[in-house]
Amino acid sequence: LFSSGVDTDPAKHGLLVDLFRLTFPFLLFVSLTALAGGALNSFQRFAMPALTPVILNLCMIAGAVWLAPRLGGTPEKQILALGWAVLAAGLLQLLFQLPSLKGINLLTLPRWGWSHPGVRKVMTLMVPTLFGSSVAQINLLLDTVIAAKLTDGSQSWLSLADRFLELPLGVFGVALGTVILPALARHHVSTDREGFSRSLDWGLRMTLLISVPAMLGLLLLAEPLIATIFQHGQFSAFDTRMTALSVYGLSFGLPAFALLKVVLPAFYARQDTRTPVRAGVAALVANMVFNFALLAVLYQVMVPDELKAQGVMAAIGKQPGLHLALGIASALSSYLNLGLLWYWLGKTDVYQRRPGWGGYLLRLLLACVAMVAALLALLHWLPAFSAMGVWERIGALALLVGGGGATYAVAMVAMGFRPRDLRGH
């Protein structure tokens, strides 16, 4: 369904089935982990849930570096190491949180309680909440279906690009949304409109503080990042360029993806789960419209006449680069989702913008301009990454990331931003 054409290759189809069987139990473990994390967050215990995702990264690294060579055989057999890594990570993530649950006396055996009014209320609120929070993931899933019709590698390029966005989103966007939800709920229950506005305002500012420079950094450093991390073995310079196209498209929407993680809790804290669903449905439909519209534009611009003569499906299956449309469409639909939520939030009159936004945005803009100037200067001075060795790439990338980050931080401090501004929600 999501990788059409794979079933014509028995070996590849068998490998995918094996990986699916290995990783499917991860869904159970990660769901229980999320439940445990939600319980801990409700008791203001944020550290353990925030650290838990690191376990998956460590297991993936261990699977690729340690387990894969020990499986021996062909690369197709060695890739099963990553499946085992995902399975192990799911179990370890759950076990990692159990001591913290025991510390707050919440580690109990599961039991049925469907008749409890609290459980029934959670079930009523949960379904629309799941959809409203998953629009970006659903869009990406639909994008992979379309990418399967494009040239070979499009799905992988799109998936790898999504990994680069998950770092700032997972570390900062999700973390801010997680921290801010209990505060917003507390202010709403106590009818503290001032406190509600103050907490949401703080979340919005912190999100922009991270997501805007992260977006610009990804746009400028996409190829250096991909070349340094992935361009080895069978991953060629061509794959680097194609993955970078996906990063360009998706990273354009990074501020919207991150702001959604903060704006959605403003609705959930008030137990309003219907409004995010309305916005999500609109974004979902818009994403498909954007996908086909942008594919049509790129088809006319990028596909040569000799390929067009073979028919549309044959042409899009051979012309590389068309997957750029999918990344841009996801970004545009996320901005639409954010815009609708922002409009409806304003109509509820529960949020009043705090003073100082004009000066804050100006400082943010100037700091980003300084960072971009520094990165462009370094990129002009450094040789092409495709021509460097592995260690040269690592050193050059460290210089770029460190130099750009330091320039941004110094510029913000020079314009009056202080570490204490990170507090105050």
Residue ranges of predicted features:
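Membrane-embedded alpha-helical bundles of multi-pass transporters/translocases
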Residues: 1-425
